[in-house]
Structures are given as structure tokens and as C-alpha cells.
Regions:
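A compositional/biophysical signature of low hydrophobicity enriched in polar/charged and small residues
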Residues: 1-94
Length: 94
């Protein structure tokens, strides 16, 4: 499974539907797309949400990002991520 960071930015539409129930619905969508939730944060700064998720493929992560945006009205930017330990190992091999 590959780790992906989903950066979420609330839209006006997305702000209207905020609820614990919608969070549970989002987790269901993530799992239906083959994903696993590692962490979910509300943050301050250029983004409002930060999700750390795992997916079997990039295609699954992309599909989930679009499904979540349609369902919630939240704009997501999605990026693959590796641990610092793996990054250090990769750099030692170059």
C-alpha cells in the first residue's frame, strides 16, 4: 500500500455540510475505494484538512479524491508520500 496525503480546502458548499456524520461517510468512501485511514487532521494555514491515507494504487487514490470532492464539496490536492526513513534509504543508493 502506498501512502497519500490528501490536502483539503473548504469551499462555501463544503462548509455547509460539516458534521461527524459526513466524516464517517468520507471514511466509508475511502474504504470502498480500497483505502485505509492512517490519520485525519483539521489544520490551520493554506489547507483546512490533512488526511494521511493508504491505497493499493495511484488510480485508487485518484478515484477516491474525486469521489470525496463530489460528495463533500471540499477541494482536495493529493500527493504520494514516503517515510523519511525510506527517503534516506533511497538517497543513499544514488
Amino acid at each position: 500500500m502506498t501512502t497519500f496525503i490528501f490536502f483539503g480546502k473548504y469551499t462555501m458548499e463544503g462548509l455547509k455540510g460539516m458534521s461527524a456524520e459526513r466524516t464517517e461517510d468520507a471514511i466509508d468512501v475511502i474504504e470502498k475505494c480500497g483505502g485505509q485511514v492512517k490519520e485525519m487532521y483539521a489544520v490551520l494555514g493554506p489547507y483546512d484538512l490533512l488526511f494521511v491515507l493508504s491505497f493499493p494504487s495511484t488510480e485508487d487514490a485518484m478515484k477516491c479524491s474525486v469521489f470525496l470532492a463530489r460528495m463533500t464539496g471540499i477541494a482536495f490536492t493529493t500527493a504520494p508520500a514516503v517515510s523519511v526513513e525510506l527517503f534516506d534509504q533511497m538517497m543513499s543508493e544514488t
